[in-house]
Amino acid sequence: MRSKYIVIEGLEGAGKTTARNVVVETLEQLGIRDMVFTREPGGTQLAEKLRSLVLDIKSVGDEVITDKAEVLMFYAARVQLVETVIKPALANGTWVIGDRHDLSTQAYQGGGRGIDQHMLATLRDAVLGDFRPDLTLYLDVTPEVGLKRARARGELDRIEQESFDFFNRTRARYLELAAQDKSIHTIDATQPLEAVMGAIRTTVTNWVKELDA
C-alpha cells in the first residue's frame, strides 16, 4: 500500500492532539508503523519562525498584521513544509499525519476573516498545485465548547483570541467545505471522549480497508 497523508482539522479545543493519538494507534493496529507528524503552521525551521510571527500576539509589537499578510505567511509556511518534509516522506513510503493543512486557511481566512474565497482557492492552486491530503478528519465543535477547552489549557494565541462570531463563521465554512469533499470526514467532537475516539477508529479503519479493496 502506498503511503498516505492524513490531516486532522477543527476549531481550537476540538481535540486534535487526542485524535492524532487515536489515528496513530489505529494505523499501528492495521500494521502501519512508518509515520511522521507535522503541524501547521510549523514543521520546519522557517515555518516555525513564521508560526511565531503569525500566532504570537507580541511578535510584531503594536503593528497590526493585515488579513492578506496573515494568509501569505500561512502559505509560505505551508509550501515550505510540503516541499521539504511532507512530499519527501510520502515518496519514501512514510505516512504523514498532519495537525492542520489548507482546509484551515479556507475556513479561518475564507470564513472567519471573510477573505475572498476565489482568491484563496487561486492562491492554494498556485502554491500547492493538485497536492491534497488523502483523508481529512474534521472534528466539529461549537465555538463555545472549543474555546472553553482552549482557555482551560492556558494563554490564548492571537487567533484564539478572536470573537465567537469569527469562530462561528469559521465553523460554518468548515462544514460547507466538508459537505463538498468526500475525502473530508466530519466527526462530532462534542460527544463524550470515548464516542469521539470510537468514531475516529471506525472512520480510519474503514478507509484503510477500502484502500486495500
Curated annotation (Swiss-Prot):
Cellular component terms (Gene Ontology): cytosol
Gene Ontology biological process: dTDP biosynthetic process; dTTP biosynthetic process; dUDP biosynthetic process
Reactions this protein catalyses: dTMP + ATP = dTDP + ADP
List of residues binding ATP: 10-17
Taxonomic superkingdom: Bacteria
Keyword Ion transport: no
Gene Ontology MF annotations: ATP binding; dTMP kinase activity
Its EC number(s): 2.7.4.9
UniProt keyword terms in alphabetical order: ATP-binding, Kinase, Nucleotide biosynthesis, Nucleotide-binding, Transferase
Signal peptide: none
Gene3D superfamilies reported in the protein's UniProt record: P-loop containing nucleotide triphosphate hydrolases
Family in the record: Belongs to the thymidylate kinase family.
Task of the protein: Phosphorylation of dTMP to form dTDP in both de novo and salvage pathways of dTTP synthesis.
Protein name, entry field: Thymidylate kinase
Gene giving rise to this polypeptide: tmk
